[in-house]
């Protein structure tokens, strides 16, 4: 860890006492900052509150008083807090810098950074690359949006390690000097319009991952979307991946995977299910090769890696019915991949937070959907979608209720699929919690 001096004696406001806010506050305190933590909820009964106040850190919960901005030189914002918060808007008029904690991770780390973002596939790719590193000479440390606070992991990472960092658009909006040696963008489609306001703002946020890169760095990019790069001043070397074309990078030719002209593995030896996952595999191979991982470690991983929890996860088979948990599908593209993975009659559980999106992108993916079980804020939109396509549907209270109601309709040889196409935050704190509710109820059948 680099012991930087820039925060010594500076007044820093940490917005949000979640996992990242807690670790950020402790780090800034150790770096000599005068730290105040603010959360919109009453946090006075939490263990984090007790620990931070015992350290001498001020913690204010329940509201966001504008007086907190007096003499503040920096705000470290929880990525989920919108920029429309009045405190943030006032800070912007005062030209107070606003960052997310991944910027702090970059400032203190001695490690190389491999940053991964994208609308879909980023968690799978991050996990896959992490597994490829496990047998490698140097450590690949997972952090960021995948659940391990980046600034905490960075404190213990050495100069020969690599931070394999999953990055959301929310996190990338709050970077200033952050520079990954290898940046990987899986794809960019419509998402998070409630947060970003419009599609262009969302694309711009994703492309932030490239803004400080130089000609010494790499950008791994989906060949299907290469025209997006025309609107940005990309200084890094671009390496493409494609399932359809021979490209400068990772590609498939006659069911064999290549990196440039080097053979890596036969497609038949890759165990990760789903045609869409071939793009994730190619992106991961490109990153691993650029990071210096040997082919044997890459191939060993691809022959054993079956996927991640809550992403097309097989839960169980009961009375001839197979149950799949795809709670991580928080947008229509991810759900289209899930629906396309099955040909059997499918009972589809869908719904959640209304981000302003429609569901018309799923029009061509639902021929085999036998029944829909709809819950959450998007109930009205999804019932209209079901009616338009003449799909029988049942309105449910939540995921647990939806699983219970499938029993009235499902038959042997069919599939029950939770693939919500929506974020979870209207009813569940995370997609993981939503998925666990599904799993728990399925196991009671």
UniProtKB/Swiss-Prot annotation:
GO terms for cellular component: cytoplasm. SUPFAM superfamilies: MurCD N-terminal domain (SSF51984), MurD-like peptide ligases, catalytic domain (SSF53623), MurD-like peptide ligases, peptide-binding domain (SSF53244). Gene3D superfamilies: Mur ligase, C-terminal domain (3.90.190.20), Mur-like, catalytic domain (3.40.1190.10), NAD(P)-binding Rossmann-like Domain (3.40.50.720). Keywords: ATP-binding, Cell cycle, Cell division, Cell shape, Cell wall biogenesis/degradation, Cytoplasm, Ligase, Nucleotide-binding, Peptidoglycan synthesis. It is found in: Cytoplasm. InterPro entries: Mur-like_cat_sf (IPR036565), Mur_ligase_C (IPR004101), Mur_ligase_C_dom_sf (IPR036615), Mur_ligase_cen (IPR013221), MurD (IPR005762). GO terms for biological process: cell division; cell wall organization; peptidoglycan biosynthetic process; regulation of cell shape. Pathway: Cell wall biogenesis; peptidoglycan biosynthesis. Its EC number is 6.3.2.9. It comes from the Bacteria. Its main location: cytoplasm. It catalyses: UDP-N-acetyl-alpha-D-muramoyl-L-alanine + D-glutamate + ATP = UDP-N-acetyl-alpha-D-muramoyl-L-alanyl-D-glutamate + ADP + phosphate + H(+). ATP binds at residues 118-124. GO terms for molecular function: ATP binding; UDP-N-acetylmuramoylalanine-D-glutamate ligase activity. Cell wall formation. Catalyzes the addition of glutamate to the nucleotide precursor UDP-N-acetylmuramoyl-L-alanine (UMA). Belongs to the MurCDEF family. This is UDP-N-acetylmuramoylalanine--D-glutamate ligase. It comes from Macrococcus caseolyticus (strain JCSC5402) (Macrococcoides caseolyticum). The gene is murD.
